[in-house]
Amino acid sequence: YKYNSDLFLILPGTEIAAVLFDEKDGYLKMHHLNGILGTKAMQEQAKSGLFQHMERIEPIVAYGDWDGRKVTEEMAENLRDHGCFITYNHPVWSRVESHEFEIDGIYDSLEIYNYNTVNESGTGFNTTYWDEMLRKGMHVNADAADDNHNGNFPDNFGGYVMVAAESLTHDNI
């Protein structure tokens, strides 16, 4: 990528969504997962190839009821099949129940701090689900993010990811 340097690295990624509405189009809950382009090995093992620049992934839309756990599994499988490192985003803001996303080994990181949703609705910080998963013996990392939308309130430079890596390369990060 043309902006990469010894001090800065761009990791391509995408966000996919699934939304559950009631019968009158009222929002009930949703899943948001990020797929960050994985290591060379993950890319080589991508069953479905890699996502293309600006490729749009249509959201999954359901009405009335859904099997939220199955939806999460399908979304994660889609990202994994495209060579991605996977994060599950802002579960409190999304109004999901723990059984819908607390699935061992399905994603790499759980977002425990989302600066945008902290400012928007006070629902962006929560370590309870992560702690619950760890107590169940699940192995999942945690992350913090800005989720920058440049909307009606400040949502940048409040959450960030720090990585202890040997070097600033895609595979090491």
Name these PLM-found stretches.
Residues 80-84, 135-138:
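Sec-exported extracytoplasmic/periplasmic mature domains
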